[in-house]
């Protein structure tokens, strides 16, 4: 019987979308069973496979696994049918297989990489895999540089795979890197980083081109400096300085005049002395741009490239040599000498790429390993011992033996270059198969056991970004002979997306057309950003490369064990059936040994992860804004969209790109397209920001023209004595007809304009919170400290609580308060210390304030029902507060509080009461605290004491502070009340209305006095007073203190009158009436239930020192402060910010900073510097230089 045996070669290309499984035996059943105690698969899933059949995961064996959603371990059990295969053996074997569940790919993209304070961060989150249109993210958070969560959205559902969110930054944020963290269902996270800092976009770009390295054999090197304004050359003066940095070698010259030199074309000749005597760095500088040049004695480097770490005996060993200079420039036509185990084997000459190919016949090599060495063949030259001699770097490479029991091998010729998509790649395979297994059978015919063959592969998007080719055969002795190679493929996608502007250039303010081509009926995201923004900070732009990097095609293989997601798939080492003992053969003893450096087929299989099956198809698929486009657009059924956008006025280069996601064809991304916006002819006026009367300055007008033709410029000047109005006009020679009426005239009435130096308004409203609601930011003064910001946050929260309890909270008001609360939360976190406490000012060495930390904790807890608050931040603060508590229950009196009248409130209340309290402010706080605790006896006693000390003025009750300023005996206006006095009265009112049975009559008399102290914004003189005042209003707004009845208010003067209706429907409406004549008499009549308060207040203090003052310095005309000196002032422990600087009282001090003249101004007038007490603004002083 003659049996024809062929060599069966199975070729499998392993990508992220396909896995091949080959069964090399006739069998009856191939059962897939769950390896964790589960039963076998159903009979319908049995496979009937013939010899050497390959199938992919899309076949039946994969269909069994598609119902599994989590990572599982399975066993593949196979046995043969002796009758079908005419065999005499029954074989059964099991192998463990891990099946990876489907995982989506998620990426985050912001509209730009860097933001200024106060800007809005706009980001898009996208994910894709083929058969889904929506996806839900469990959690999306934004973290500041201190790792605080300042924004969070939960269970966010995307629409057609794209989610778009935005977040508003405050005007004074923490500078540094912010992180967007997206949590997926698999509990893995995706992060994206952006920066927040102060910056100014450059008007033009300067580049310095210089070699990275200069060798000691170079007599000169070239430096190119280029300045461009988006393709247009910039005219100006250029200075190039080449400076050799300091080097400690004693051989270097010490002549300081030769350290820095100015060069135009080439380096001066004395540079030869420097390079020969010492190796150092050169720094080439041009304005703010610089580059470094390294001086080296290394003239060239030889490298091995595209080398295999193993050789296979009988198959030639191929490799490549590369020779380049220190700047990685190929060295052409150079002689290289190759050695094997220190024996010369040949000379090779480099080609135009500096490369040379070599091959080694391995038929007679039996060594476990051999060493290759290549060096440059150079002539011998003489040098003095003190000289730096030219050197060339040699290369070494160690090649190990590949083990085969039958001495049979396969070798796939690798491809070092990246393969282009939509092309054919011809793969060549060399093979050498040992014929000894067939020699005992004379009926066997052998064909081509040594040689090579080739076959083509179509490089499609399915193979991107990398594919593994695995080729193997079964030797008759039972050994698997195989090899594999990884091909790098261009980052291409099945989904082709293309965007292009209709014109490459455009004018500011004109329309630009953008053509988008993609798969039909889908959504695409577009982005166009100013190129200058990208120059500020390098970011990983969303591109085909960045998307491809998100894929983990092959899981990592541990050096000890075959682990995948915690599952060990290694079969383990089994004891051999026959022990390894010395063998006696032909009169000699042979000892079995092994070389652990040999490669083998098992390592190839492990690295290619052929035990892992994946049922996932991972196909990779206004007006000077810094971001022009950030939109989601729909593509029609034709697969295209023509869009029109108004070009911003910025003269710059816009970079636009887009990506699309489609459920049928997957993900696609376009290449970047640019639009250059320039003005061929324009003017620019260089003038100071502002000038004062009687000052003079030179008005400089720059005319820019990038036209190829001459442009007529007219200069008209009529010399007249006195003041002259200057008008600069840029116009074209195109004429057009004007309307009959000529230019339309419009009268502008500014809100804050003082008409004829007189402005008086009467305000009418039915709810005391009307003004506070209209001005949720209720202070006119700066509020940069943590103490003031916390009180302001609390105020907004109490306003919302009051409106909610009185059923007046609208969506518009809630949205506004939500926005302000997020900004306030960001600001408050900037005062948080690393231990969880809060300080009044942000300084790294600041000590936490117990009072401020407690207030912040309480405020943020109340804010939880309206905005997101990081629970970890609250826990950290609570732990710190607990550490400050004494065993008696009292707290340490640590930290600082900047309102002197509030400091005594930090003592333990009950201990203070028992020890005898005489301070009226403490009486008020104790009364409120005991009222909240329900201790009526203590409250009654304290209120009686307070009632005796209250001045009862016209049935209006209030409480003065102990050291009050003197007031006029017969004041014309209601006296202005200091912060401590107002706050003390607020606490008494809180105590009254917080009792079990509040005395509303008594409380209304306090409310009338407090209402007279409210400012035009609905607040009081400081944040602390606003906080306490709004607490009582919000807490007991429903108790009937503020009327809901109908009121009619008549405001009249000579010859005119106005009537206002105030009722429950418009109780929050602020109604105004402007006084247009003065002097005059006006009458206000109120009918019904309600009150109207008109107030003007002033104050003159008597204190010798202030708690916290604000310094407001006005700049001289034509001058601006230097940022470096401002930063030095900010770093001092007394300063928080530079525009309105808050100063803690410690001692008399000065705060110098530098200014520079940006515009030339003559007869400069002095600029005032104003200092005022934050809490009592009446204490102020102004100085003139």
From Swiss-Prot:
- Where in the cell is the protein located? Secreted
SUPFAM superfamilies listed in its UniProt record: Alpha-macroglobulin receptor domain, E set domains, Terpenoid cyclases/Protein prenyltransferases
A single GO molecular function term of this UniProt record: serine-type endopeptidase inhibitor activity
Q: Provide the residues annotated with a glycan attachment (glycosylation).
A: 80, 155, 347, 452, 725
Q: Which residues form the signal peptide?
A: 1-21
Q: Which GO terms describe its cellular component?
A: extracellular space
Pfam families for this protein: A2M, A2M_BRD, A2M_recep, MG3, MG4, TED_complement
Q: Look up keyword Signal and say if it applies.
A: yes
State the UniProt keywords alphabetically.
Bait region, Glycoprotein, Protease inhibitor, Secreted, Serine protease inhibitor, Signal
**Record's subunit section:** Homotetramer.
What protein family does this chain belong to? Belongs to the protease inhibitor I39 (alpha-2-macroglobulin) family.
What job does the chain carry out? Answer: Is able to inhibit all four classes of proteinases by a unique 'trapping' mechanism.
Q: What is this protein called?
A: Ovostatin homolog 1
According to its UniProt entry, this protein's organism is Homo sapiens (Human)
What are the leading ranks of the lineage?
Answer: Eukaryota, Metazoa, Chordata, Craniata, Vertebrata
Instruction: Point out the gene that encodes the protein.
Output: OVOS1
